[in-house]
Amino acid sequence: MNVDIIILAAGQGKRMQSNLPKVLQPLGNKPLLQHVIDTCSQIKKSKLHIVVGGQSKLIQSFVKAPRSTNWVLQRKQLGTGHAVKQTLPSLRPNSCVVVLYGDGPLVRIKTLKKLISRTSGDNLSLLTFEASNPKGLGLSLIHISEP
């Protein structure tokens, strides 16, 4: 199965109070985004689509991505859904699509492979976690209605 991996890296990270975008902040000896790229590059039959904003040249100069990486410019930062929408023309038909944040370096290859293996056909798999204090985090509101 082909896997299209969308990595969202267009945010400016204003709250970081740094000259570097949030995805370029270091963790260990490399930028947050590089950790995500390195993990995703281990997925077979995958193609990376990295959505970047106004600092695209800076981001591309900081990280090492596979040659086949599709760098997608989000001209106006209009949210997560809009960022994903920018990649739609480049996604392969019938591929499994995985969306990740470029500032989320702790996702493990084992977790991604398990998520991908559970996604088939028209099904949707969503990887979330329960936070003890969700303040300041994006929320997933899930309502399951019985048929």
Descriptions of predicted regions:
Residues 1-18:
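N-terminal nucleotide-binding beta1-loop-alpha1 segment
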Residues 8-9, 51, 99-101, 126-130:
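Short beta-strand segments
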Residues 18, 104-105, 118:
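Short, proline-centered helix/strand-breaking motifs
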Residues 20-26:
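Short glycine-enriched, charge-decorated loop/helix-capping segments at active-site entrances
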Residues 30-102, 106-114:
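Conserved N-terminal catalytic core of the sugar/cofactor nucleotidyltransferase
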Residues 110-135:
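Conserved donor-nucleotide/metal-binding helix-loop-beta segment in metal-dependent transferases, i.e.
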Residues 139-147:
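Residue-level detector of conserved catalytic or cofactor/ligand-binding positions
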